[in-house]
Amino acid sequence: MFVRIRDYNENLRAVRFCRRPKDSAKLRILAKDNIGVQDFLTSAGSYALRDLVLPDAFCVRQIRKNPQIDIFGKTHLTELAGFVTTRVLKDGYSELGGFGRNPHGAQYPCRGSSSGSAIACAAGFCDAALGTETRGSLMMPAMANGVFGFKPTRGAVSRSGIIPLSSSFDAPGVLSRSLSGLKTVFSAMLGKDDSDPQSFVPSELRKKKFNGRTLLFLVSSGDYAALNTPAVRRFISALKQGGFHIEFRHAPMAEFDYKIIS
């Protein structure tokens, strides 16, 4: 992997820093450069933050408890995880990293903001990579670069030690070329963090009783067809079996304004 990074990273612009991965590690992973990793600087792609030193984020500390996983570097990203500019820029661009490139071909977009993490996974630079999502920042680059991406429920993974974009929407997650790698890294990230008010342990929810509680789903005009898919029907059935009362209401599409969420 280190050799692949050396040979191809200058063209793909995925990795900001790295060292040789540990030989003993079974999963060699990279972290998006808005996530604190004490071994490397953390910039969120911003020239203004180029020399910022952060301690390990909570999720990184949790991962380090698993000796089979080695965090050996940082990936480039869309600057500040979402452009703060009056200019229209390409997904995956940052002042420090330049323009990321999809390894499947320059004619394909890399998307963002976890662009470097997705590119690195697709190019074989790592087994998995950490990313963050505020509005599609994990899922869109995963789809564009042909890798698996997982955005957990907000609070399932602590946000402590991560440069924020929107406290209402930010969620750390994982990208990987394999589902097994994704599952292993995600499981290692879990843990209750008292410094993050949204933090919870997913397994503890199974112990709670939800009888009589109502879950309201807001559905836009273009999403009604999805309600009849087998996967969604199974999901709704499981919620009802868990004691929830389910309601659906129409929600008109809101005018897009990225500033609202940040």
Name each model feature, range by range.
Residues 1-52, 57, 76-83, 206-208:
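Short, well-ordered alpha-helical
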Residues 56, 147, 232-236:
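Amphipathic alpha-helical segments in well-structured domains
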Residues 202, 213, 249-262:
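Flexible, acidic loop-helix segments that line cofactor/substrate-binding pockets
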Residues 2, 6, 60-64, 118, ...:
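Non-transmembrane alpha-helical segments in soluble domains
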Residues 227-252:
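Acyltransferase
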